[in-house]
Amino acid sequence: MALERCDVEKIAHLARLGLNEGELPRITDALNSILGLVDQMQAVDTTGIEPLAHPLEASQRLRPDQVTESNQRDAYQAIAPKTESGLYLVPKVIE
């Protein structure tokens, strides 16, 4: 599948990109190159191959959960403009 100049102009318009006349041939070639790679990858026979969640079979070692900071909720509530029942009150922005 190859893109024509009019296709690239339409894509640029939809993406709100301002391309000048000098950029169109270069962008068209770049997009066609990318689509060529996609076509090449789609042509590979992947029957019988299990999809991978991650290309490397490595697992992260997780540290144990530990409280590292003190609870400063009361201090933050004290400097907030408005609070009620432990909640921050903010102006309504969507009606």
From Swiss-Prot:
<dbReference type="InterPro" id="IPR003837">
    <property type="entry name" value="GatC"/>
</dbReference>
<dbReference type="Pfam" id="PF02686">
    <property type="entry name" value="GatC"/>
</dbReference>
<comment type="subunit">
    <text>Heterotrimer of A, B and C subunits.</text>
</comment>
<comment type="function">
    <text>Allows the formation of correctly charged Asn-tRNA(Asn) or Gln-tRNA(Gln) through the transamidation of misacylated Asp-tRNA(Asn) or Glu-tRNA(Gln) in organisms which lack either or both of asparaginyl-tRNA or glutaminyl-tRNA synthetases. The reaction takes place in the presence of glutamine and ATP through an activated phospho-Asp-tRNA(Asn) or phospho-Glu-tRNA(Gln).</text>
</comment>
<keyword id="KW-0436">Ligase</keyword>
<dbReference type="GO" id="GO:0006450">
    <property type="term" value="P:regulation of translational fidelity"/>
</dbReference>
<dbReference type="GO" id="GO:0006412">
    <property type="term" value="P:translation"/>
</dbReference>
<dbReference type="GO" id="GO:0050566">
    <property type="term" value="F:asparaginyl-tRNA synthase (glutamine-hydrolyzing) activity"/>
</dbReference>
<dbReference type="GO" id="GO:0005524">
    <property type="term" value="F:ATP binding"/>
</dbReference>
<keyword id="KW-0547">Nucleotide-binding</keyword>
<comment type="similarity">
    <text>Belongs to the GatC family.</text>
</comment>
<protein>
    <recommendedName>
        <fullName>Aspartyl/glutamyl-tRNA(Asn/Gln) amidotransferase subunit C</fullName>
        <ecNumber>6.3.5.-</ecNumber>
    </recommendedName>
</protein>
<keyword id="KW-0648">Protein biosynthesis</keyword>
<keyword id="KW-0067">ATP-binding</keyword>
<dbReference type="GO" id="GO:0070681">
    <property type="term" value="P:glutaminyl-tRNAGln biosynthesis via transamidation"/>
</dbReference>
<dbReference type="InterPro" id="IPR036113">
    <property type="entry name" value="Asp/Glu-ADT_sf_sub_c"/>
</dbReference>
<dbReference type="GO" id="GO:0050567">
    <property type="term" value="F:glutaminyl-tRNA synthase (glutamine-hydrolyzing) activity"/>
</dbReference>
